[in-house]
Amino acid sequence: MDRKTLDDTSRFLSHVLRHQPEAIGLTLDGEGWADIDALIAGAARDGRALDRALLGAVLRSNDKQRFAFSADGQRIRAVQGHSHAAVAIAYAPAVPPAVLYHGTARRFLDSIREHGLVPGSRHHVHLSARRATALEVGRRYGSPVLLEVDARDMHLAGHLFHQAENGVWLAGQVPVRFIREA
């Protein structure tokens, strides 16, 4: 399977499984799961060739583990990053490491200094336990800036953290007082 096909399919899956399932007539349940046969049929109506083998190849090749199959292999979902109102994955609360990281672009710093980290159109702020991962995310948006989040103190102050299946840390928001430039 060539890299371009895998990347294009991953982008398509991100779009329909996180943000706009209705674009292909797909329905997500409250945990974000979609029936694989319905996804394949919706993709075909959209002019996209998609089958179980390609879905499996995308899941295996995606280093960020953005997607997961259900235990019975009949459903698929994005593990985090949803903006769709119908999806509210019930992540278990988790105790974070002392420090987490967030990568962003320099142009967003003024807003972050004023409002903290907010989820925007998504349901959660995404954080990483790894500096390199956070910097990589920041590079997607321009000149990267690495922010350090005092997750231990934030957690002790009563803020909830969750960890998605792929290791991404999630928070509802991160107040300014817990953020510093790394």
Curated annotation (Swiss-Prot):
GO biological process terms held by the UniProt record: tRNA splicing, via endonucleolytic cleavage and ligation
Stored InterPro entries: Ptrans_KptA/Tpt1, RNA_2'-PTrans_C, RNA_2'-PTrans_KptA, RNA_2'-PTrans_N
Pfam families, alphabetized: PTS_2-RNA
Signal peptide start-end: none
Single GO MF annotation: NAD+ poly-ADP-ribosyltransferase activity
Annotated keywords: NAD, Transferase
EC number: 2.7.1.-
NCBIfam families: PRK00819.1-4
HAMAP family: KptA (MF_00299)
Job of this protein: Removes the 2'-phosphate from RNA via an intermediate in which the phosphate is ADP-ribosylated by NAD followed by a presumed transesterification to release the RNA and generate ADP-ribose 1''-2''-cyclic phosphate (APPR>P). May function as an ADP-ribosylase.
Protein family: Belongs to the KptA/TPT1 family.
UniProt protein name: Probable RNA 2'-phosphotransferase
Organism: Pseudomonas paraeruginosa (strain DSM 24068 / PA7)
